[in-house]
Amino acid sequence: MTMQGKIPRPRGNVPRAIHLPLTRRSLIGAGLAIVGGGLGLASRRADAASGRLLFAGVNLAGGEFGEMPGTQGKDYRYPATADIDYYAELGFNLIRVPFRWERLQPTLGTPFVPADQGQLTKVVEYAAGKGLHVVLDTHNYARRRLADDGWTQDHLIGSKLVPTAAFADYCGRLAGIFKGAQSVMFGLMNEPWGMESEDWLVIANAAIAALRREGAQQMALVPGVAYSGAHSWVSARNIVMGNIVDPANKFAFEVHQYFDADSSGTSPIAVGASIGSERIEIFQRWCRQNGFRAFLGEFAAGADATSLAALDDICRTLEANSDVWLGWAAWAGGTWWPDDYIFTLEPSKGKKMRPQTRILATYARHRASRPN
């Protein structure tokens, strides 16, 4: 997901209540004990050999919405139990939960806000009880805002005001809370942009080191720069991310891929029925050649025939290449989307299932595994 206005923006037409920063095109308690499936190398290899993806999920947007810092329930919200129930009942086994670093930790280097930490904890616990894994998605684009300048300026991670050590501290605190939750995966950062891949590599390695120092052994999902586009992985020089250092050796590369003309996800119109599969191919080949695993953290389609065909096609491609892909999370669920949002997966006002959701649910029911 890209950014616009004053905070991370939803793709396409934006709900009025959501004010977001910088479009892609304008600047272009304590450890949880949760029963869940582990993500060991042996199990990943077994599923790859069987031609089965581990994860089929959806993004549940809302925690990244609104003015900064915002008020929970007014400017932003975390997934409710009913949101999780809807997708669990359709057969999905994963949710990706976007939220803002600033809301968990308004002041760098300090303990998390109990209310926001508590809400995320409830989401993880409830989802695990429903058999769903949770990707914790720090939805900040490799930058954050500070109270000192009235929450108006975006400061890159690695800058003087937001040093890499501050991000590592944040990641370590997140790990300390959720290291006992085996259903959790740590999405290091949503769609980094505005920096060189070499600089992002240093930051990502510091984040992973912080996770592992705190004892978190779950999967880390590592994005690249240039919004972590699969289509631009090589051209953006994200191949340098092959130098990731993970003492636990439990990481995968997270990429995003949209089907519109410029891969921005700002139009619902797919440019071809196989465009998604075509665009991920070069990244997929790089992963296979280098022995890496991957996760498609965002993709979406409109409701026209070509776009729906492209959605079905990419799901089939991911499944056919399960030696590379761990799984996927489609964009986007979340009950704060307006009924006419171009990529909503929520039921229509008439309670009718969206055609996109129907396609995704078919793959989720037939292909995805559940936590042990």
PLM features: what roles do these ranges have?
Residues 36-40:
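Hydrophobic h-region of N-terminal signal peptides that target proteins for export
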Residues 51-236:
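Active-site mouth of glycoside hydrolases
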Residues 76, 169, 176, 180-185, ...:
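Extracellular glycoside hydrolase catalytic/binding regions
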Residues 316-317, 321-372:
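Extended, alpha-helix-rich binding/interface surfaces that flank or overlap catalytic cores
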